[in-house]
Amino acid sequence: MDSTNTFLKNLDTYDEDALTIAVADYQTSGRGQGVHTWESEPGKNLLFSMMMCPKWVPLRQQFLLSEAGALAVKDALDSYTDGITLKWPNDVYWYDKKISGTLIETAIDSKGIKRCIFGIGIDVNQTEFHSDAPNPVSLAQILGHEVDREEVLQKVIEAFCKYYELLRRADYMDVSGIYHLSLYRRKGYHWYEDKDGKFEGAFVEVEDDGHLILHDKKGVIRSYAFGEIKFIVNS
């Protein structure tokens, strides 16, 4: 199929009270955040999307859904290796290497969130990468052997259901708190680049609407939306 997100988006009927999942061995048009594409060797990685109708999540706090999805991937990967963190806004890292990317698409109507589709790509068994992605890694490369993709999928789904239930109960601080503790570069100063150039910054928080807040070495607070800042790795 072209992409699991598109497949779910085009469904004519679905159960609004259930989690609907689409899985693919290969995607011809797999996407990451913005204009980025996702490289995946057929039959090697885990490519899937989950669709839900969380009408009870406040529109101004919809980034909580991204947090829940990213945490689910982290929990699943934590069972195989250490060093897993969440790189704002939508990547999962093993130390300084990217092992997973996520893409959330939300449909909104006059009442708030109508539907949410969360696309996930996890590098499971691919060992050679040919795109211009600077730092990919797979579970097989980390562990030295292949991993059952179905097992990884089940672990992600189980973890997501746990966090989704917390959101359903309006335990927003629990989800957000765990997300903050799981962030890549949560401590210390690191190199970043924005429209004005490179700078060293330290993490402050991720706001409810998803903005990343940093402060630089002059103490200036900086706020960024998606796509407005680049993480400089190994600088």
Question: PLM features: residue spans?
Answer:
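General beta-strand structural signal in soluble alpha/beta enzymes
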Residues: 24, 84-88
